[in-house]
């Protein structure tokens, strides 16, 4: 799926666009049939707004949380600079109740267009004649029960069972269901956020003043961010420090567990990232641990990462997700893809930085070990997606979301932009040499800071940076850019350091060749960390189908393995998920209801979607019954995706 800053005097910077392309850019030379003949980044096909004509200088959101009717009600106000004198302002909306619109303090005419099944309804606001190049537009509205970004939980659905809870998930195009918006990563704005609530609230900004007594919670986001990074959550929340500039928020009953999980590493991650890129610009980096139905591992909401409770395993083995979300403070939040077609610029860079952070703190062998796990995830995604022509097209690095009136970015979501993107950046580092590549990393993020860009601008920036280095330029020119960016499937596999994986491979090979479990014991994995357990189980799965091998012929062996290593009882959900995957391959029927029960407790799509697909492959009736029984537990995004998976 899926961080922050603190900076003053940044409003004027939010108006700076990415530099215009030259008449013949490097990208146009290398990709003559791909690069659009226009200046600036490509238009985002996933928005109905006419954002090209407007630049927000600030956005003010004032909302009241209606806990009884489960909705947000209030207003959003845009301070805009106008270009080219448009007659109308068009914003994205989805399932919103629009009550009134004011332009420069006066009521304005507006209309809501016919609903597009993916992109929602355009809100068209008539602008007064001769309104000038500065506008203030205020829209009074409320959300509705059909809102796709919000999930509301009853007290019984929370850990503490004391108060209701709600949270938002706006990426990719769900901000339009929370407020009328330029719902595109191409548009950024600073934010003032004022929330009235009977329960504590956190938001994607720095807390200015908050009071449980008055029920008023005020936040300021001083760095311009796109709408998909707007975030709110509320409920029975408390906080504890996990570093000199970081706090963790959770329900009080889980607070000490969450504090323990993150306090050892958070500041180390920040320091390492600052050394790789440049100083952290967001002032505070906090983490909110959400209820189990949160659909992602983490979401990089500025100033407060939203995190799945599956990270809190008690062994501090899953905190690399925090390194990932923190890395978004530079890649994604500070420098942003202009559209979801270029999503790899967000996630590929973030995975690359995440693993650089891991390498800086734990050594290059651990960095490569993490990359091996990522490569396995990429292979799995490409194999699954290659069964369908549309899905296969989403295994390209740069995807096309324009066909057939527009595709849903959520449908294109997979590990591909993460892992194929980071693999490409690792390839560049290897080809150029880390000593030469590191200065480019810093330059790239400084050059595009506060801006949104496309892949072609990335290419231009890369070539421009090495313009006086013939050796590097020759290597860049030798790359098959068409294949790299637009060919579906797997890229060339990098040469990884397998030192930390070799023990896992060896143990997996022993199990493959074994006729019974008599030679195995829990001592086999006594020295393994959770990541090594994951690689061991992945390696077992990869034997399936090779040279006619099938784990279904070794059902009893796999069942015994689960018992010997207590895999279903692991405290780490990554291990549990991979265990059920191999158990399904071996058709261990006793594990089917256990998997169904587990799926009722986790909402993270990384586990939920593969889990349901696996269960559906062996027991469709149980899979569908389990989903029907638990579908209201899942976030709307997750619920929709699993429903499609089971069709």
From Swiss-Prot:
Top-level lineage group: Eukaryota
UniProt key word Cell inner membrane: no
Gene Ontology terms describing biological process: cytoplasm to vacuole targeting by the NVT pathway; lipid metabolic process; peptide catabolic process; protein catabolic process; proteolysis
Binding site for substrate: 169-171, 295-300
InterPro entries the UniProt entry points to: Aminopeptidase_N-like_N, Aminopeptidase_N-like_N_sf, ARM-type_fold, LTA4H, LTA4H_cat, M1_LTA-4_hydro/amino_C_sf, M1_LTA4H, Peptidase_M1
Key words, A-Z: Cytoplasm, Hydrolase, Metal-binding, Metalloprotease, Nucleus, Protease, Zinc
Co-factor(s): Zn(2+)
Protein name (record): Leucine aminopeptidase 2
């Amino acid at each position: 799926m899926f961080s922050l800053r603190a900076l003053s005097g940044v409003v004027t910077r939010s108006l700076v666009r990415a530099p215009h392309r030259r008449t013949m850019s490097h990208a146009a030379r290398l990709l003559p049939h791909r690069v659009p003949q226009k200046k600036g980044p490509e238009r985002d096909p996933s928005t109905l707004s006419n954002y090209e004509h407007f630049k927000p200088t600030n956005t003010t959101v004032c909302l009241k949380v209606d806990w009884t009717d489960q909705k947000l009600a209030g207003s959003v106000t845009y301070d805009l600079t106008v270009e080219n004198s448009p007659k109308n302002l068009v914003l994205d909306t989805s399932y919103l109740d629009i009550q009134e619109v004011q332009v420069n303090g006066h009521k304005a005419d507006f209309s809501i267009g016919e609903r597009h099944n993916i992109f929602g309804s355009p809100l068209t606001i008539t602008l007064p004649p001769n309104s000038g190049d500065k506008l203030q537009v205020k829209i009074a509205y409320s959300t509705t029960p059909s809102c796709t970004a919000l999930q509301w939980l009853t007290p019984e659905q929370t850990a503490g069972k004391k108060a209701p809870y709600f949270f938002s998930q706006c990426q990719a195009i769900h901000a339009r269901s929370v407020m009328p918006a330029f719902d595109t990563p191409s548009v950024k704005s600073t934010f003032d956020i004022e929330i009235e609530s009977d329960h504590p609230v956190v938001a994607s900004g720095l807390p200015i003043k908050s009071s449980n007594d008055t029920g008023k919670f005020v936040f300021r986001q001083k760095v311009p961010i796109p709408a998909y990074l707007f975030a709110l959550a509320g409920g029975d929340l408390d906080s504890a420090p996990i570093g000199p500039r970081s706090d963790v928020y959770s329900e009080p009953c889980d607070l000490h567990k969450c504090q323990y999980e993150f306090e050892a590493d958070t500041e180390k991650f920040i320091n390492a990232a600052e050394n790789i890129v440049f100083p952290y610009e967001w002032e505070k980096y906090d983490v909110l641990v959400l209820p189990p139905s949160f659909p992602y591992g983490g979401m990089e909401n500025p100033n407060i990462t939203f995190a799945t409770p599956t990270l809190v395993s008690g062994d501090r083995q899953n905190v690399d997700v925090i390194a990932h979300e923190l890395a978004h403070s530079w890649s994604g939040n500070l420098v942003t893809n202009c559209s979801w077609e270029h999503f790899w610029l967000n996630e590929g860079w973030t995975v690359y930085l995440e693993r650089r952070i891991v390498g800086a703190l734990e050594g290059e062998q651990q960095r490569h070990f993490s990359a091996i796990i990522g490569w396995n995830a990429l292979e799995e995604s490409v194999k699954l997606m290659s069964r369908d022509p549309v899905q296969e097209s989403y295994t390209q690095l740069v995807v096309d979301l324009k066909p057939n009136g527009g595709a849903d970015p959520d449908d294109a979501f997979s590990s591909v932009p993460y892992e194929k993107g980071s693999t490409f950046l690792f390839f560049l580092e290897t080809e150029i040499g880390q000593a030469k590549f590191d200065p480019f990393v810093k330059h790239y993020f400084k050059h595009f800071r506060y801006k949104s860009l496309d892949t072609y601008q990335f290419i231009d920036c890369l070539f421009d940076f090495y313009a006086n280095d013939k050796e590097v330029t020759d290597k860049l020119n030798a790359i098959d850019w068409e294949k790299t960016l637009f060919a579906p499937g797997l890229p060339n596999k990098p040469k990884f350091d397998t030192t930390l994986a070799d023990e896992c491979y060896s143990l997996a090979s022993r199990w493959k060749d074994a006729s019974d479990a008599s030679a195995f014991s829990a001592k086999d994995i006594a020295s393994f960390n959770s990541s090594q357990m994951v690689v061991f189980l992945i390696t077992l799965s990869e034997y399936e189908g090779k040279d006619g091998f099938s784990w279904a012929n070794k059902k009893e062996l796999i069942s015994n393995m689960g018992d010997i290593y207590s895999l279903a009882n692991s405290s780490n959900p990554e291990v549990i998920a991979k265990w059920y995957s191999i158990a399904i391959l071996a058709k261990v029927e006793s594990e089917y209801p256990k998997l169904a029960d587990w799926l009722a407790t986790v909402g993270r799509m990384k586990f939920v979607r593969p889990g349901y697909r696996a269960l559906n492959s062996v027991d469709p009736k149980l899979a569908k019954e389990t989903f029907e029984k638990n579908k209201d537990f899942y976030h709307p995004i997750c619920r929709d995706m699993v429903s499609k998976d089971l069709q």
